[in-house]
Amino acid sequence: MSTTPMAAPPGADLKPVTSSRGRSSTSDEQKLRSSCESCAQSKLKCSGDKPACARCAKRGLACKYVIAKRGGRKPKGYTSTNDNNPSKRREDSHSPAASQWSSTGHLEQSYPYCDPTISGSASPALIAMSDFYNPMDQNLPDAPTSHSDISMDFDFNDCFSLGFPSSNELSDFCNVGSTDMFSPSLDSSSSSSTGPERQLLCDGFSLTDDAMSDLFPLSPPEPQQQISCTPTDKNPHSYQEACLNGSCSCLVEALSLMKQLVSSPARNGAASPPNIQTIIDRNEATIESVRRMLECSCSQDDGYLLSVMSLIIFRVLGWYATVARQTACDVDSQPSRSPQSSISSAGSGYCLEGADSARMAAQLVLSEIHHVRRIVHQLSLKLKAQGEKERSRPETRMEGLEAMDNEMTLPLSATMYDQLDVDLKKRLRALSWEMIDRLRRY
């Protein structure tokens, strides 16, 4: 009995064809993105031209459109098609991995869409930065195409265009005029008054002078006796070298200056009138010596030295006031003379003659105060630092040699240093006011 083979149904022969056609139709339905990969990474609008957009064509970049991602599940044929596509696997093998990043954060090889003119050291991060700093303006110049040309045209010297103040500006800050530190209420109308204003100036000036006179008797120097106050060594580094060698003599020098300023009474018990030439020369030498002692490192730790230097400045200001007052008294006590007569109250260097001698003496003292103002400013900083060091000292109880050493290094209290600072500035201000008042009256 022969059996006749059954014919295959029509749908069976068409099954693989239908499957292949379905996969091809699925791949044909996949759409590309409207923006190329380069414009998408740069967050810029793409013209969408094929095969290369206007931006990539202008910059010489490889324009590539990737498949658009849709929401939902992926089609069944999408995964199998991608897995069976050898070109896709080969393209994925060139994708940057984590191991391909160098220690500096750059890729060791370029992306496939990079221009071949870019060297291998150029990273996509630099390319993205160049795209970010170049907006979508067709009038701008082309971006650099090599790693060596990728640089920001930024001049760092512009950050320092303001510069630092010159030495002349700093010196102008120190050389502030005497009228700048006083109240503008002192006008010419008050110059003729001899009431409470002048009494207030004299009282403020003589506060410390009375206390100093109890310790050191004030007596003018002898006209014929020239006291040498200039140190034997004028080298400004001598004090610093002596401190480094452990043989600092700043305190001894300060005490010697103080002894010379507090001169002994004149012979025969008669006080001779002060000599302007001698006083000004001696004060200038004293100020120079104090300035060099302030530059020494020992002035930062020695409270005794700062105290003695403060007393020296008090005496210098006192001698300036003495010579100005003495000249004014000589002018007031002289009877009226002819224009040919003159009153000489100066030495060979400063000749103050006639009725204007008091005004000239006040002007001379006022010009010398500028040098004292610089010293007072430097000494004020040292006194404040010493006061802060005293305040920062711990409150713990110390005994024996440790407590004795602490008292030797910080002999005075912080309040004492603050008071010396205040008194120095007050004394300098009072002397300046007095000289300005004399200039307005004469």
UniProtKB/Swiss-Prot annotation:
Sorted alphabetically, which CDD domains does this protein's record hold? GAL4
List the Gene Ontology MF annotations in alphabetical order: DNA binding; DNA-binding transcription factor activity, RNA polymerase II-specific; zinc ion binding
Q: Where is this region: Disordered?
A: 1-34, 74-107
Instruction: Specify residue ranges for compositional bias: Polar residues.
Output: 96-107
Sorted alphabetically, the Gene Ontology cellular component annotations on this record are: nucleus
* Annotated InterPro entries: AflR, OAF3, Zn2-C6_fun-type_DNA-bd_sf, Zn2Cys6_DnaBD
As annotated, the DNA-binding region falls at 36-63
The protein's location, in the record's own words, is:
Nucleus
- One of the GO BP terms on file: aflatoxin biosynthetic process
Task: Name the keywords, alphabetized.
Answer: DNA-binding, Metal-binding, Nucleus, Transcription, Transcription regulation
Pfam families (alphabetical): AflR, Zn_clus
**Per its UniProt record, what SUPFAM superfamilies does this chain match?**
Zn2/Cys6 DNA-binding domain
Question: Per its database record, what is this protein's job?
Answer: Transcription factor that positively regulates the expression of the gene cluster that mediates the biosynthesis of an emodin derivative that may be involved in black Sigatoka disease of banana.
Please give the name of this protein. Answer: Transcription factor MYCFIDRAFT_198930
> Which species?
Pseudocercospora fijiensis (strain CIRAD86) (Black leaf streak disease fungus)
